[in-house]
Amino acid sequence: MNAPLGGIWLWLPLLLTWLTPEVNSSWWYMRATGGSSRVMCDNVPGLVSSQRQLCHRHPDVMRAISQGVAEWTAECQHQFRQHRWNCNTLDRDHSLFGRVLLRSSRESAFVYAISSAGVVFAITRACSQGEVKSCSCDPKKMGSAKDSKGIFDWGGCSDNIDYGIKFARAFVDAKERKGKDARALMNLHNNRAGRKAVKRFLKQECKCHGVSGSCTLRTCWLAMADFRKTGDYLWRKYNGAIQVVMNQDGTGFTVANERFKKPTKNDLVYFENSPDYCIRDREAGSLGTAGRVCNLTSRGMDSCEVMCCGRGYDTSHVTRMTKCGCKFHWCCAVRCQDCLEALDVHTCKAPKNADWTTAT
């Protein structure tokens, strides 16, 4: 008996994902290569031709992107710090994160979005700091303008975020645009959501000029907010990520569950449910939670009950040096004493079979 047509389409994205042998963004590995731009461009594996051309033509932009990798990976680890999967990186892995992102999960959606956002942020900042020859401050922010407070003059250095977005789109999306599979479309969608997130927090800053601090004349400029705001925003999008399936002509998505809203360009999308990340699983790329510190009094994701997946925890009595008895001394220093603090540290027990498993 033949399966209903609707059932075939529900399975199609998973089939396409299984047939896709490699979905990692190898440019993430730029952080590990370092060195000169030529060394970096020639030694990052898996770059497509257009990425390698951009790499050679714009060494100053590549330096900014390379430095930015550390920033967005740190932000990813901050957002996932209390979760079983904590955005851990693998130094010798060309994909930076290992096999865990081969699954088209919520975690993959977040990493692609935060990495794309990180590229926009790094390039735009480098432009404003005069570190990139091909861009500078936003050339459109000149002359006078008007807002709710009245007329002001554009001055200072407005962040040229449009250049950052344009270059990030050309470089980051290049590999995905060569693919026609479901995972490539998912990555492109989440890359765009990440870029849009940075621009969302572009804010106008102003300085007043006048006698005795009066604001008879204002000079304003546009500046990116701290990257933490982008990370927090994408974290909320991660928690509200929408599971999708491919539409029938293979050009876009539709929601996997009719009760869910249709994803917007700002939403994160994913195909597959995440593993539980409880145990070390070579195939899934999960390191498990054995040895992870848990919070005995928490009721959240970092609680010992949740983090340790019901396996229990070990308690160690440790001492650490802390600052105590701090006092302010005029003017202008804070002086503290060094004190020993005793505390209990709780870590998740390993499963009875601690060897690598191939279970998914």
Swiss-Prot record:
It is found in: Secreted, Extracellular space, Extracellular matrix; Secreted. It comes from the Eukaryota. Glycans are attached at residue 295. Residues 1-25 form the signal peptide. One of its GO terms (molecular function) is frizzled binding. Palmitoleoylation is required for efficient binding to frizzled receptors. Depalmitoleoylation leads to Wnt signaling pathway inhibition. Disulfide bonds join 76-87, 127-135, 137-157, 206-220, 208-215, 278-309, 294-304, 308-348, 324-339, 326-336, 331-332. Expressed in brain in the thalamus, in fetal and adult lung and in placenta. A lipid is attached at residue 212 (O-palmitoleoyl serine). Belongs to the Wnt family. This is Protein Wnt-2.
